[in-house]
């Protein structure tokens, strides 16, 4: 085959390849209708359940998010798991202990005698640790969590939760599977370090459904025995082959991990050990922020509510994950002025109450116009204008955004796009009088929240599929 033929073959292959990839995700964000989404799969375990939204749904595919809700019963332990994507987790309800294992970081929590004599001494591997008194444990950082906490977790970082309260612990998590930190396909892939998922990963298209086991299950027991310097019998227990408790298990008796005292406030700093720059960046970096404190809100009006934002300025690890969050709480008939996300997609999850939401796409079509309630999820794509009005005594929500410094622009209000336009542009653009143009530009003095004078009108019907 000559050079000309090779070149022709190369361009033909390239054309076919681009055609194939174009067919893989054609017009992902050409959305003429949005819907309030509910979970499509429930994974039950001994100590709780995981509810998974279908991230192949058009609007979630557009946003790039995979979304999950965790319900962990009292004394339930969500076993260590890591993902192929960075994620933000929000504590909707309850209290918990949380631990994360960041690769290469030291065990900074230690000196707690939690194991008795004889444990860990298998095959002469006790290493002389406290014989007769039991040896002392050490592990990476453990944090107390409460309602309103938002946790940033990089890909590949194993994470666990323990419900140490008396009520169910409810968490929601958004993983950005479209981010370049995910080097696999656009599927959420949990890698289990312990436990299993008897129902399998039903959201993975093209894979035969089968039980999902933990990572150790794939290794030969003899290899594990050599790697951990334990017996083959113990190695087989690591594989959880005959146990179907799921990935959330019930803890029997006391949960004796080393933990700090409960936080007295949000400003406390953990003492840091001397180390190199990498350790200071990854190992001691703060990963949790509480968004339920109105005193630290970005927008606060006692009669209307508050809005708090979380971005890479107040939680620097988000710069690495390229994610941010917004927490909102508004009273009945309060309205969030019409706005759009300048540089991010958003996934809005309702944590309390109800609201009427309208959403408009790039064709000027109303693609969403209905009430949304607790437990439902709505995607707001980049540039789609949205307005929210509370229809219950209190409406609360959390938004996850696909940019670490997500920005909004408002259509009405003191800092809106209309306020920045000359009166002549408004008057001529909408064919209205100068007096009407002044009213459009200057009548609304608020920047974000305002009082609604009544229910949102329906006007022209929304576009139906």
Curated annotation (Swiss-Prot):
PTM sites of type Phosphoserine: 308, 443
Coiled coil: none
Record-listed Phosphotyrosine modification sites: 306
Segments of skewed composition (Gly residues): 117-133
InterPro entries for this protein: 11S_seedstore_CS, 11S_seedstore_pln, Cupin_1, RmlC-like_jellyroll, RmlC_Cupin_sf, Seed_Storage-Functional
Alphabetical UniProt keywords: Disulfide bond, Endoplasmic reticulum, Phosphoprotein, Seed storage protein, Signal, Storage protein
Cupin type-1 domain residues: 34-236, 289-438
Disulfide bonds: 29-62, 105-283
Any GO CC annotation of this UniProt entry: rough endoplasmic reticulum
Pfam families: Cupin_1
Locations listed in the record: Rough endoplasmic reticulum
Region (Disordered): 112-135
PROSITE patterns: 11S_SEED_STORAGE
Protein family according to the UniProt entry: Belongs to the 11S seed storage protein (globulins) family.
Subunit structure: Heterohexamer; each subunit is composed of an acidic and a basic chain derived from a single precursor and linked by a disulfide bond.
Function: This is a seed storage protein.
Name the record gives this protein: Cruciferin CRU4
Source organism per UniProt: Brassica napus
